[in-house]
Each structure stands twice: as structure tokens, then as C-alpha cells.
Curated annotation (Swiss-Prot):
It comes from Salmonella typhi. Residues 26-137 form the sHSP domain. GO terms for biological process: protein stabilization. This is Small heat shock protein IbpB. PROSITE patterns: SHSP. SUPFAM superfamilies: HSP20-like chaperones. It comes from the Bacteria. Belongs to the small heat shock protein (HSP20) family. It is found in: Cytoplasm.
């Protein structure tokens, strides 16, 4: 019998409350780049990516339907240094998140090597139930 760990997949879903709770309780390792997902209230979320060494022009954020994709392509140095120790990763990446319905990207900022993507859930206005009048109608004579 095989067991499959779905927590890495759940980490990519934002705006689903049950999955957000699973995210908070999941202690799984993260892939590059490391990121956090914060929930400030029921309608506001923030994704923070740690991108040391990247410049703003190296980054691209796209939203297609409910798929939010962040791509980074760092500029390659002319002369590759001879590393004694390389702890900072500077590699191209593409990271995608699936947003829940009614989630919108409200903004993105890049400060001190951290990319912040703010998300807002916009609940559609609920339309009150409509009462339908029942008219009296005489029976059809056949």
C-alpha cells in the first residue's frame, strides 16, 4: 500500500479556508524560491517570496484565470566567479499558485530582496431571494 503526501500540492491553493489551515499546519520543506503565504483576515492574503540577488526587472508576474505565475530569470554575470562556497541560489524559476474564485491580485511590491504579492477576496453581492407571485388561473376547458 502506498501513501501519497499531498501537502506540497495544497500549498499552491490560496483562498480555500480548509487548505489555508492545512498550509499553516504543514511543516514540509519548500522548493525554490522559498515563500510564505499569510492570511491577514478572511479576505486578505499575502504571498512573500525571498529573492536575494534578483532585480525587479528579472521578475515577471502573470495571472491567467485562477493561475498566478511568478517567473524569475536572473541576469548572468559576464565572468562567472570561482565559488569557495555558494549559499545563495541564483537560478531561473517559475512558481505557480492556484487562486480560489473571486480572488484578485491587488498589488505587488519588491523591497530588499522580498517580493510581496497582495491578494483580496471579493465576495460577490448576494441577491436576496425573489418572491414569485402565484396567479389564479381558471382551468382550461377542453
Amino acid at each position: 500500500m502506498r501513501n501519497y503526501d499531498l501537502s506540497p500540492l495544497l500549498r499552491q491553493w490560496i483562498g480555500f479556508d480548509k487548505l489555508a489551515n492545512a498550509l499553516q499546519n504543514s511543516g514540509e520543506s519548500q522548493s525554490f524560491p522559498p515563500y510564505n503565504i499569510e492570511k491577514s483576515d478572511d479576505n486578505h492574503y499575502r504571498i512573500t517570496l525571498a529573492l536575494a540577488g534578483f532585480r525587479q526587472e528579472d521578475l515577471d508576474i502573470q495571472l491567467e484565470g485562477t493561475r498566478l505565475t511568478v517567473k524569475g530569470t536572473p541576469e548572468q554575470p559576464e565572468n562567472e566567479p570561482k565559488w569557495l562556497h555558494q549559499g545563495l541560489v541564483m537560478q531561473p524559476f517559475s512558481l505557480s499558485f492556484t487562486l480560489a474564485e473571486n480572488m484578485e491580485v491587488s498589488g505587488a511590491t519588491f523591497t530588499n530582496g522580498l517580493l510581496y504579492i497582495d491578494l483580496t477576496r471579493n465576495e460577490p453581492e448576494t441577491i436576496p431571494p425573489q418572491r414569485i407571485a402565484i396567479n389564479e388561473r381558471s382551468a382550461l376547458n377542453s
